[in-house]
């Protein structure tokens, strides 16, 4: 089976991949939630867009702290408590990863660790040794 035939059969490419060359740093981010990284205090909003902004800001901050950028994200897993939030969450995520197309998996779950959380995103980044 070729990538092309699989793409045509299901409407997307399940074989998106990444080839690592040279020295790189691979970063695994735990699930980021709509809370302050320093205090673990929730943002106090039940809006999926506002929660997603905070989640993506956390991801950006953590990547920058280890010398990376959002463009280094190669994989994300998005956990939602309500499938109806999917479009708004993905649109908001797109504001942070314009031009970046990480492999993505979306999962709808019954609940997250705190009842007020609507979205959680974990990610994997590959940062080249010569990243600026």
Role assignments for model-derived ranges:
Residues 1-74, 80-132:
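N-terminal presequence-like segments and the immediate start of the first folded domain
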